[in-house]
Amino acid sequence: MKKTVKFLILTLILGLCCFTGKFSFYANAETATKIYLGGFPAGFNIYTKGAFVAGLSDVITENGIESPAKDAGIHVGDVILYLNGAEINNAKDIENTLKTAKSGKITVIYVRNGDENSTEILPVKDLSGIKRLGIFVRDNFNGIGTVTFINGERIATLGHPILGEYGEIMQITGGEIYKSDITGYVKGERGTAGELRGIFLKNQSIAKIDKNCLYGVFGNIAENFDKSTLTEIEIGDAQIGCASIFTTIDGTEPKMYDISIVKTDTLFSDTKNYVIKVSDKGLLETTGGIVQGMSGSPIIQNGKLVGAITHVFINDPTRGFGISVKNMINQ
């Protein structure tokens, strides 16, 4: 979760510690009166559609140094979808396509800032005789976040999407959610966001990811996932006043921390429905307030789940935004 956005003041998306379109959806509270409360940390491994260009490189050839991708106008953050009509999802796909491609330029279909584009690249051979484009790609993203709730067989997390280099919602092909152990944190300070640090428990997959949208990252829980240790809770509407967040800053077990909801807006905002302020002395002394990795942490008021944390204010880590649970409930 590395993106910053402007909304009167600077805020930071809290999603994966490492990581616009508009959906016209409003959930009906009657569709699920009780769900299972999250608050526990999770490790995310998300696979993207296409190969994400993580870097550009020079290629040393017999004729000197060349930069085919850069010369063709490819940028870091672009997502390559096709080479000469062949679908690309990872570095191996690129390698195989280049091996079978005829001499000359190849056609590249890629996405930048949500728009599909086309260009031509002339591959070059390195000193080993291997065709290169001069790019580094990755096909997955991973990091730490927080589970908001489980509704039937569906798991809801983060409360915001995983974004690409240009702020667009990343298209995904799937992924895994694992249990996670929080091993430490970096305290947030004015002007600098803090973060949770943790490890994936790789042998403990809890869900398969199938959706990355405006309202968060969603999937289906594993068949062997035990919900008996979780707390059932009703969903409700928030109002200005005292509330709590249920989050984990050490180990695997979440705890309640005091906050105040200081502003609500569920009519005109899809995701920034609440402004919250941390008042819990213990949380302020440890993390400094809201930090990256808390994204998805449940907001509870009057014994009901009303939303999840999504952003921290860069200039004030005690404050942040939250999303209404009703925007997440049926995803």
Describe the role of every protein-language-model region.
Residues 69-91, 299-302, 306-310:
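Conserved PDZ fold ligand-binding element
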Residues 2-26:
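Sec-dependent N-terminal signal peptides of Gram-positive bacterial secreted proteins and lipoproteins
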Residues 124-288, 292, 301-302, 310, ...:
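Serine endopeptidase catalytic core focused on the charge-relay Asp
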Residues 28-32, 40-42, 75, 95-135:
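PDZ-domain C-terminal substructure recognizer with occasional recognition of PDZ-binding tails
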Residues 67, 291-294:
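Short, small/polar residue-rich loop motifs at catalytic or cofactor-binding pockets
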Residues 49, 76-77, 239, 295, ...:
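Short, flexible surface segments
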Residues 82-113, 316-318, 323-327:
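PDZ domains, with a preference for the canonical peptide-binding region formed by the helix
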